[in-house]
């Protein structure tokens, strides 16, 4: 429940930030235009982002004939989660990783790299796919798409303010210092909120995935193994399209940074600790 409340508050914050920046650029008319642009971008992302991401990663759809064990595993977990059977994809990449996409449970897809199938045991793989199906069940793909779109739009509006300035309610030019401050700080604030949303949804998918599989320890073991392997194996497509990193079960990008604030995923150690606590207590709330 806490993660859902936190997500709702963060979504409200990123929307408010977007509208406020629009207002600073063009007053009440700017706020209205900014909101309409955001709605249009979210609509496009909602309908087409899954196709774009799967094509971007050159994901190949598989079925029971081409990947029988993997396909049956997903089907069994989808049944346990009371979800429609998603489309199943494989990505020919060495880094162990996986993600879910699709605008709703009826149009969902799950994808895994060939690397993750080589590295994980069947039990660990069940934990990973249960995590991805939890994202589908919670409609996290929609949430992450909206937050990413809004963060990108905030950055675009901030750049507009930097180069063209803004107007107040009476149409007079806005304070140029304020415009520069907005241009510098707003994209950072938008990105921080987006990443906080992503971290909250990962925790919730860990909890939901453990509930679907009934085996939180399997997911904990999988996360530990993925973390150790992924850090030493580059994922070129993800590096070229870093905005898609938040979709993965583990951050696929190399490099460091301010771990707690500028990460799309919670610390692996904290995720494992929470899962092991679920395994010990049998509680998933």
Curated annotation (Swiss-Prot):
Its EC number is 3.4.24.-. GO terms for molecular function: metalloendopeptidase activity; zinc ion binding. It is a multi-pass membrane protein. Zn(2+) binds at residues 131, 135, 202. The chain crosses the membrane at residues 7-27, 30-50, 146-166, 177-197. GO terms for cellular component: plasma membrane. It is found in: Cell inner membrane. The active site is at residue 132. Binds 1 zinc ion per subunit. Its cofactor is Zn(2+). The keyword Protease applies. Keywords: Cell inner membrane, Cell membrane, Hydrolase, Membrane, Metal-binding, Metalloprotease, Protease, Transmembrane, Transmembrane helix, Zinc. Its main location: membrane. GO terms for biological process: proteolysis. Belongs to the peptidase M48B family. This is Protease HtpX homolog. It comes from Burkholderia mallei (strain ATCC 23344).
